[in-house]
Amino acid sequence: MAADLIVGIQWGDEGKGKIVDLLAQEYNVVCRYQGGHNAGHTIVVDGKTIALHLIPSGILNPKAVNIIGNGVVVSPAALLKEMEQFDNLDGRLLISDKAHLIFKYHEEIDRAKERLRGKNAIGTTGRGIGPAYSDKVSRQGHRIGELKDIDTLHKKILDYFETNKIYFEALGISFPSENELRMELQRYQEVLMPYVVDTTNYLWDLLELGEAKILLEGAQGTMLDIDHGTYPYVTSSNTIAAGACTGLGLAPKDIGKVIGIAKAYCTRVGNGPFPTEDNGEDGERLRKQGHEFGTTTGRPRRCGWFDAVAAKYASRINGCDEMALMKLDVLDGFEKIKVASKYLYEGEEIDYMVSDLENVEPIYLEFEGWDRVEGIRSWKDLPLNAKRYIEAIEELIETKISLISTSPDRADTIKR
């Protein structure tokens, strides 16, 4: 039995957490395969809001095993804080021994480099994600499995400090004392090591037996992918569906159905091109009605209309079999609603993605709005204009929309 996959097809914050939480009731294994605690999922169940950054959204299913894969960069401090929200995680949380660690100095490097970039800042969350991935690629990172031998890991980190001493001093970053570092590592070892296993072999065994239903959960979104996003204004990992293979140790044939997640409009956090951004009254209204502030940083998100060109590109690169359209209710009350169906690029109309997205202008289709869809749970009860809007998006992105969210609550979801 293959593993199904959920992936964001915009700039992140699409509402993946709600869909994973909804579908996780049907799966007994949920896996996270990339990113770090820069990502944030907000889930509302029975009126209670839960924010997750590292632990997969399946944690709310008491029968599900949740896996943090090798492609994730893990801040032990952030993970420990997140774990405190739950009473008992024994047997419900597994962490890959190959996942790389984020330490405080990674966060300090991140923030220092952003300051140095000035007006050219990328707009990172300052959580140390990029520096941790940079250490991983340059073969000087530290993996969570190394916590089993504190003496060796302690020495390796001190050697790392010595090797990078000039760099750290140039950035104004101080080192922790040897004793502070050792105490920190001992705490992480004590709490986290009981959850650390070879998750790749664990998943292989499950797939071979064919009895488990496995769901793979991406973080951020396609347009933030390190290779296929709006570089350099991207995250430091492969956010697309293919990242699940390297981020969990799976083969392409192990991937089953791919479900893309998109908002009924677009948002972006941080800097970088955003063709459909609306800096006027409509954009501000989207932000207010959608409560568009980052789960991780609290920063106001940039808001704009649905970009069908970007969504079609993302659907194709991820191989989406179907799509979930989130936060349709945020568009309630708009007299007119826009969708970018094409771009104007170098004097020509195009319907495909380009690498220099900052040089395109959106060409819009305009739709009549509707009064209210909030809380609607069946297709037949949707206003006609809302149905027309959804069907137009389906046609433009060439992907079926099978799920429609009409409020943050898990139950307010239309299945087609």
Curated annotation (Swiss-Prot):
InterPro entries in alphabetical order: Adenylosuccin_syn_GTP-bd, Adenylosuccin_syn_Lys_AS, Adenylosuccinate_synth_dom1, Adenylosuccinate_synth_dom2, Adenylosuccinate_synth_dom3, Adenylosuccinate_synthetase, P-loop_NTPase
The entry's keywords: Cytoplasm, GTP-binding, Ligase, Magnesium, Metal-binding, Nucleotide-binding, Purine biosynthesis
Record field: catalytic activity: IMP + L-aspartate + GTP = N(6)-(1,2-dicarboxyethyl)-AMP + GDP + phosphate + 2 H(+)
GO CC, alphabetical: cytoplasm
Pathway the protein acts in: Purine metabolism; AMP biosynthesis via de novo pathway; AMP from IMP: step 1/2
Residues forming the catalytic site: 13 (proton acceptor), 41 (proton donor)
Needed co-factor(s): Mg(2+)
Any one GO biological process: 'de novo' AMP biosynthetic process
Co-factor binding comment: Binds 1 Mg(2+) ion per subunit.
Residues involved in IMP binding: 13-16, 38-41, 125, 139, 220, 235, 299
Domain of life of the native organism: Bacteria
Chief location category: cytoplasm
Annotated substrate binding sites: 295-301
UniProt GO MF annotations: adenylosuccinate synthase activity; GTP binding; magnesium ion binding
This protein's record includes keyword Glycoprotein: no
Xref: SMART domains: Adenylsucc_synt
Residues annotated to bind Mg(2+): 13, 40
Annotated residues for binding of GTP: 12-18, 40-42, 301, 327-329, 405-407
Enzyme class, UniProt record, top EC level: ligase
Subcellular location: Cytoplasm
Stored PANTHER family: ADENYLOSUCCINATE SYNTHETASE
Assembly notes: Homodimer.
HAMAP family with a match to the protein in the record: Adenylosucc_synth
UniProt similarity note: Belongs to the adenylosuccinate synthetase family.
Known function: Plays an important role in the de novo pathway of purine nucleotide biosynthesis. Catalyzes the first committed step in the biosynthesis of AMP from IMP.
Protein name: Adenylosuccinate synthetase
Species: Nitratiruptor sp. (strain SB155-2)
Name of encoding gene: purA
